[in-house]
A protein has these predicted regions:
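Nucleic-acid modification enzymes, centered on SAM-dependent nucleic-acid methyltransferases
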Residues: 13-147, 157, 161-520, 539-585, ...
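Class I SAM-dependent methyltransferase "Motif I" SAM/SAH-binding loop
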Residues: 150-154
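A short glycine-rich, Lys/Arg-flanked "PGG" loop and its adjoining helix->strand segment in the class I
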Residues: 593-609, 634
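Short glycine-centered segments of the SAM/dcSAM-binding site in methyltransferase folds
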Residues: 612
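Short, Lys/Arg-enriched N-terminal segments with co-localized hydrophobic residues
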Residues: 1-12
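Hydrophobic beta-strand segment of the Class I
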Residues: 527-528
Length: 659
């Protein structure tokens, strides 16, 4: 009865209030162009503080939010006061001449919305002030409130705040919440002081890291390594062979002007397999791979046996899969190129020293062992589980664990230094959190699922994490390369600068289940969200890679967020056919629809009768769309418009197959 009453109230209000601009038109071509350009940005954007998945372009969210707040001038119920004010505001841009008709004003508003989707214009004071004035003209009696119960990385609440609104962001994931609190609360609250402390802290961490870890990351023939090249190994099961096969799936590692490749050879008598890294102007013919389709091919010519993928899995599950260090990538000058080389005795000795040092750390610190469970029950998105990976700790070598653990110790030392120097508890916590997120942003490169091809690539593939036969180990101390703390701190500093340009501190961040929001009835003017994508993005599992380190870095500063073994799974709204085997409860399509309906119904409860809901959904499957629309309608919303916006850059993974 309550839902029926709400729906009746919605229908009545829908007839009384003017349509919003987004309900009659939207400059989708211009918004899409800006969105694709924004996706190509490599620095100077809030999302470079830390990795997150399925992120929406902030400029597109800004444009959609603005078009949702503003009434459509061509609607006869649009207030005359808005017509007058909007015309005056847009006259600054030459978009609305005196005496313009309502149709002309609407066209001018659409042009403004389309241009304001440009990421760079978000920091332009003239555009920002005009957008805020337009929102104020649409809401002359109060500051509108927008809320996003699936806030993720914060594009929607961040851009609502940029428009001058009271913005509310909530999520369940602690990694997302740390990003939200840092970008949308700590940065605007502390301003330049946080940026200054962050820069000082980055210098402190870099200096201490070099001092404490430098011996484990030595130069190679006088040059700084960017990365080391590794291959997993299995035993050839060919008759009478038994050679140790290094699994090389990528025989060419750099196709740039100075090319690099791998030459593999084997000796019949000794059963020894040699790997050499070569470099030159032309890639020779006849290079071989030893891994393909999950199978292992023996490179000894007299053998050539293919160990079937099922047997490779058996060896992995039995703990018989090894790792072999075979190459090193060197920095030449200031980004003047790269040099590729075989490893030498010192490379191997340094790694061995790190392994011994890590063993000492592990014995002296009960929390050093990373025993948290890897999602091995999901062979679809996390294929390493098929090869014996059982904990998140299995994804890190001893040297990588030592480096990350040491960086955490340095962060704790800097926290103590901040307090000693007179910083407030709040500022010290916010600064260390931003630094910890920066270090955490190297974790996707600092594991044995990351791979090297012209440069370090992180471990995630699509929306999962696939097994890597040959992988790269990034040098965390080297300057200006992905996987290192220098690059991570630079990216984070630029992200903080970009967030400062939002120039609004009225964002509230809370941890909440989208189906049970701690917000009063009829309290928000806009419900704008990007809900979970049915069966595509396992956010919680993906974020656990960083979570296990963040809780070791700053768990003492955020005991409310970082007090569980792993990120919460049972309450996430997702379709996962393997959830029952993993003990996290049913996550079927039927359950997804039920819980999504609950979330939308809760959104409807919080939304004012004259409020507007806006849902972003980027799934390519019709079944997922049908389920989402059914949930929206079941929750009592009236669907008045739908717009296709292309937010993906053409070069992204799977772009040619996505809707």
């Amino acid at each position: 009865l309550k839902l029926a009453s709400q729906i009746e109230k919605i229908n009545t209000m829908h007839e009384l209030y003017p349509k919003r601009l987004i309900e009659v038109d939207l400059p989708i071509k211009r918004i899409s162009e800006h969105a694709q350009n924004e996706k190509n940005l490599r620095s100077g954007h809030p999302w470079h503080l830390h990795i997150w998945w399925a992120r929406r372009p902030w400029g597109a969210c800004r444009a959609v939010a603005l078009a949702s707040f503003l009434p459509a001038p061509t609607d006869e119920r649009c207030p005359e006061s808005f017509i007058v004010k909007a015309s005056a505001i847009l006259s600054v841009f030459g978009l609305s001449p005196n005496g313009a008709t309502r149709e002309q004003l609407q066209d001018s508003l659409l042009k403004f919305v389309g241009e304001y989707a440009c990421w760079e214009l978000g920091a332009n004071a003239t555009f920002r002030d005009a957008a805020r004035q337009l929102v104020q003209a649409a809401y002359p009696e109060h500051t509108p409130t927008a809320f996003d119960p699936f806030a993720g990385y914060g594009a929607i609440p961040g851009e609502a705040a940029r428009l001058g609104c009271d913005s509310i962001a909530s999520d369940l994931n602690p990694v997302a919440l740390l990003c939200l609190q840092t970008l949308l609360v700590a940065v605007p609250k502390n301003g330049q002081e946080l940026l200054d402390r962050f820069r000082e802290g980055a210098d402190f961490v870099r200096f201490e890291a070099e001092k404490r870890l430098g011996a484990y990351y030595p130069k190679h023939k006088g040059k700084h390594p960017i990365a080391w090249l590794w291959a997993r190994t299995v035993t050839c099961e060919g008759p009478g062979c038994g050679a140790e096969i290094p699994l090389i799936a990528q025989e060419v590692i750099d196709r740039a002007e100075t090319k690099a490749w791998i030459k593999i050879s084997g000796d019949k008598k000794t059963k020894d397999v040699q790997i050499h890294v070569k470099q030159g102007m032309a890639i020779p013919a006849g290079l071989i791979k030893t891994a393909g389709g999950g199978h292992a091919v023996c490179p000894i010519p007299e053998c050539g046996f293919t160990t079937h993928k099922t047997r490779v899995k058996v060896q992995g599950m039995a703990g018989k899969m090894g790792n072999r260090l075979y190459g090193v990538v060197l920095a030449v000058g200031q980004r003047q190129g790269k040099e590729y080389s075989d490893t030498n005795d010192e490379d191997i000795a340094a790694y061995t020293r790190a392994a011994v040092a890590w063993e000492r750390v592990r014995k002296n610190n009960s929390s050093a062992d990373i025993t948290e469970k890897y999602p091995y029950h999901d062979p679809r998105a996390f294929t390493a589980g098929n090869y014996g990976i059982r904990t998140w700790g299995d994804l890190f070598s001893p040297r990588q664990k030592l480096a990350l653990w040491t960086l955490g110790e340095i962060l704790r030392d800097y926290h103590a230094q901040l307090l000693k120097d007179g910083a407030s508890e709040s500022l010290a916590r916010d600064t260390i959190t931003a630094l910890a997120l920066s270090v955490s942003n190297t974790v996707p490169f600092q594991n044995n699922m990351a791979w090297y091809s012209r440069g370090m690539n992180y471990c995630y593939k699509g929306m999962g994490m696939s097994m890597k036969w040959d992988y790269g180990e990034a040098n965390p101390l080297v300057s200006d390369y992905a996987g290192g703390i220098h690059f991570a701190f630079h990216q984070a500093e630029e992200a903080i600068r970009a967030t400062l340009a939002i120039n609004n501190s009225s964002t509230s961040v809370m941890r909440a289940n989208a189906a049970e929001l701690p917000l009063p009835d009829d309290s928000a003017d806009m419900f704008f969200s990007d809900p979970p994508y049915y069966d595509v993005v396992p956010y919680a599992d993906l974020s656990d890679l960083c979570y296990v380190w963040l809780k070791r870095f700053i768990g003492h500063l955020h005991p409310d967020l970082l007090n569980e073994m792993l990120t919460p799974k049972a309450e996430q709204i997702l379709v996962n056919p393997y959830s029952m085997a993993d003990g996290r409860g049913e996550q079927s399509p039927e359950r997804y629809r039920e819980r999504m309906t609950q979330a939308f119904r809760e959104g409807r409860r919080v939304l004012k009768p004259d409020g507007i809901g806006c849902i972003v959904f980027a799934h390519k499957g019709t079944g997922a769309w049908e389920t989402l629309l059914a949930s929206i309608i079941d929750a009592g919303f009236i669907v008045t418009a739908s717009w296709p916006i292309d937010t993906e850059r053409a070069a992204r993974m799977r772009a040619n197959k996505s809707a």
